[in-house]
Amino acid sequence: MDSNTVSSFQVDCFLWNVRKRFADQELGDAPFLDRLRRDQKSLRGRGSTLGLDIETATRVGKQIVERILEEESDEALKMNIASVPASRYLTDMTLEEMSRDWFMLMPKQKVAGSLCIRMDQAIMDKTITLKANFSVIFERLETLILLRAFTEEGSIVGEISPLPSLSGHTNEDVKNAIGILIGGLEWNDNTVRVSETLQRFAWRSSNEDGRPPLPPKQK
């Protein structure tokens, strides 16, 4: 077994433990917690594949990290951190739009991977806009926080949200879920628009199939 593979796993185990302690103090935001859940599942799989005990690997990983920190100057650490690409958090929705309760007359729910898709099948002949809050890294969607479908009157008629009990999602997972939501809403003769932010980072095929972009005044 390659020694780099083992030491990488050990360091990942220790760093996950540090992040878990941070989350236990209720300091992590939604993208942070989502990555924590995804990485936990990944570490369990890697541990099983490598035949390594996670608790033991965590202790060894701590020793490796402590040794690196002893050798590294504060200035070097700052430079290393600054050179790593950081994710950006993009918002189509206000806090009020994200936290608002909504109800469905004819509810429909579908689970696609680790994403839950909900929509009101009673909505007909409406112009609907999809808005989302999510993080982006390397110009691609990293983590979806919440996506909601709004009528022109401001009513919420659909939603895509991550399932807390399951591991994280990919850009393709989100794209697939958006397609399901759009298809369900269009079935009742609704016209569905996708926000420019979503088009850019998560629904690139919108230009290919002729779906019109969100007019600037509705952005």
Swiss-Prot record:
Keywords, ordered alphabetically: Eukaryotic host gene expression shutoff by virus, Host cytoplasm, Host gene expression shutoff by virus, Host mRNA suppression by virus, Host nucleus, Host-virus interaction, Inhibition of host innate immune response by virus, Inhibition of host interferon signaling pathway by virus, Inhibition of host PKR by virus, Inhibition of host pre-mRNA processing by virus, Inhibition of host RIG-I by virus, Inhibition of host RLR pathway by virus, Interferon antiviral system evasion, RNA-binding, Ubl conjugation, Viral immunoevasion
Protein name: Non-structural protein 1
Gene that encodes the chain: NS
GO cellular component, one term: host cell nucleus
Highest taxon listed in the record's lineage: Viruses
GO biological process, one term: symbiont-mediated suppression of host cytoplasmic pattern recognition receptor signaling pathway via inhibition of RIG-I activity
Annotated compartments: Host nucleus; Host cytoplasm
Pfam families: Flu_NS1
Region of interest: CPSF4-binding: 180-215
PTM info: Upon interferon induction, ISGylated via host HERC5; this results in the impairment of NS1 interaction with RNA targets due to its inability to form homodimers and to interact with host EIF2AK2/PKR.
